[in-house]
Amino acid sequence: AVNVVSNYFFTDDKSDLCWLPDQAYTPGSWGYIGGEIFRRSPGRIGTTAEVKDTRNVPLLQTKRKDIKAYRFDLPDGDYEVELLFADLNARSERVTYDLGAVATLDNADFRGSVFNVSVNNRPWLNHFSPAIEVGGNRCISKKLHVAVTGGNLTVNFEAVKGMTFLNGIKIFRIH
């Protein structure tokens, strides 16, 4: 598991899962390709806003924006990929009188991002918007089983509207 953007280890106190600090990709290893650190205000990494629907709030308060890819060089086999997202730019709450409204790309109030995600050049999430699916400042995770051949697993991101981003990533080998 990777604590995207962070320079620190993070341990989930319930599962004892240790999240590794982020790093740029180097051949024979793993890491991000492209993108930059999200800063809500100058000099501060991430946001201090509460992120809902997760017990690991610090993991979701940072993100890599405009990310191109995340690559892992690893042995061939079957893996589970889990991506974690929280749109920290999108509007976080709907007002009471507007609860029935549905966020759409055409809505003038929509401030979220929409992007495509592929794994090893196979489309996975098309026109994906965490803000439309769950709202702003809320965690959403997406899982996929992948058969790796050729020694690498690459998750690619392509912007449709706004920017691509990633808050966290887990890769587990399935035995």
Question: Where are the language model's segments positioned?
Answer:
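Compositionally biased, intrinsically disordered or flexible polar/acidic segments
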Residues: A1-H175
